[in-house]
């Protein structure tokens, strides 16, 4: 894959490994490397622009759910070196509510929910992301 680090076997490998590095590896600052400076991230909560809001949001989530894991289950994708790559990947998100934040005071409850993230990528970076989380499963 032109423009991507040689350590990735293919595009799904890139998507799964950067997700693991950021969340399980707690390498939040690597978002600045893997997400473009002006990336739009579109979700049911609205649109943010840039990798800095993604980094801030990730730190807030890890404060509230310090053991949070994003377990990549499947990646469907298409693309090529000329036009870039697009993925849609399904994730199982799990963690324990141990910190205060969006969901209030720590409850100690374990949560599990699904996420679908669609990413457009080129040159070892995500430049557009659409994400939806099934938050209806969270009862804290």
Language model features by range: what are they?
Residues 1-138:
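C-terminal and inter-domain tail/linker signature
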